[in-house]
Amino acid sequence: MNSLVALVLLGQIIGSTLSSQVRGDLECDEKDAKEWTDTGVRYINEHKLHGYKYALNVIKNIVVVPWDGDWVAVFLKLNLLETECHVLDPTPVKNCTVRPQHNHAVEMDCDVKIMFNVDTFKEDVFAKCHSTPDSVENVRRNCPKCPILLPSNNPQVVDSVEYVLNKHNEKLSDHVYEVLEISRGQHKYEPEAYYVEFAIVEVNCTAQELHDDHHHCHPNTAGEDHIGFCRATVFRSHASLEKPKDEQFESDCVILHVKEGHAHSHLIQQHVEKDSISPEHNNTALNFVHPHNDTSTSHESHEHLAEVPVAFVKKELPKDISDRHTTPVKGCPGKVHHFEL
């Protein structure tokens, strides 16, 4: 009898929680709105192929509407901010530091649709995002000497990454790493320097083979992929057009040990097979499928995100994310968790 009473109470609790979550009059700062948002942000971060994880900044709007039978649709408009955690970093986004404004911050606006079945608790998520760096004018207005973002394929950025990685490999006797992705480059002043961030992967070849154009190196696949992430500053003492030779530099490379089964472990091969230059910001990705163009700059660039296969849903679902369900509602937008660009 006690077990039966406990089961009934549990059912009432679940039912009460669920009815709260699927009601249509949620305000942006309510707990239930935050739970839907967490689902959307987690999905976005798990399916980004390049760059950094993003953290919630503002819930701009939330609408929950009945859809078809046991389904409800949750429409979210979110403003996110770039963190300092690369997408391959297993650190939970809640523990990642949001990139501060003086370090040329980047924001991302996302339209998210969550299809939720109130009977089976299954869900399907769609997202459409575009990211934009803070303007150079804003950065310089608030901090005239702060470093400015450069395109990831800027020659000085690429040369600085190669210089630091070569120095890193020279110190290792049994391990050789290759650039997986250049994710950030910035020009610093007084003294003049280039700041870079890039991901590296251990490969199955020697240092000599690494520099042989006829030899193809591949990531190690034994149990774990040894992924690293480097932050480095190269102080330029030679003419700006020359490659680094004997420059002073500061670097910090950490090994992430991305284990098999991690949300991004299957993306490593995709990184290696593509150009190592990270796609930049400021283009739209619908359902996380978008071609990329590496000639763009930090201010006219784009995301390239993982393709998400059609999930368990048997009925027809909308392919787009309509604006007709995202009109402003009471209590929105919500509070700003960090800062506005």
Swiss-Prot record:
Cellular component aspect of the GO annotation: blood microparticle; extracellular matrix
Record localization: Secreted
Cell attachment site (motif): residue ranges: 23-25
Glycosylated residues in this chain: 95, 204, 282, 293
GO-annotated biological processes: negative regulation of proteolysis
Site (Cleavage): residue numbering on this chain: 140-141
Cystatin fetuin-A-type domain boundaries: 22-130, 141-254
Cystine pairs: 28-332, 85-96, 110-129, 143-146, 205-217, 230-253
Signal peptide annotation: 1-19
Keywords, comma-separated and alphabetical: Disulfide bond, Glycoprotein, Metalloenzyme inhibitor, Metalloprotease inhibitor, Protease inhibitor, Repeat, Secreted, Signal
Quaternary structure and interacting proteins, as annotated: Homodimer.
Stored PANTHER family: ALPHA-2-HS-GLYCOPROTEIN, FETUIN
UniProt-recorded name of the protein: Antihemorrhagic factor BJ46a
Organism: Bothrops jararaca (Jararaca)
